[in-house]
């Protein structure tokens, strides 16, 4: 059973469409990856996710970036938007998700999630390469990164840093994955390009202070 968000925050859902809401986080399933890393996965945590996807596409100030890659400056293959500690999130549903994550994971994490980064994968050509969130504290400390996905599913891959078996989770339509413990420094994750026809997806990454 999901908990609907305050009706005053949203237009009434069209007939046959699910209201935007959140399912209990107690239903998340934890998997130990080894070396102190773990992931929690909760499919369909955010209900009415397709409505939220449409709102975020229309209202978030998306922008493209270019980054130095060895001797070249290249386009980042996805659109981005970032919300720092003092910036309001672009939709009340994200405020509710943020609060729920803090309530559930705050005691284990020892601090709240502070920032939100949004990535818009427009089609199978958009991607993110293998990496860990190791800019800042994630390189030396255990931490958590919570990712909510809306829109069409894309595969999030995880593998041990240095190589090893790949763990695959298709994420979309309100799915949640939380990467915790040593995951950012002992494992890597990626959203690879795909030649298959896939629809667009937005991921929302909640992080504590000093983790990027």
Locations of regions flagged by a protein language model:
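Non-heme Fe(II) oxygenase metal-center motifs and adjacent flexible, charged/small-residue loops
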Residues: 1-212
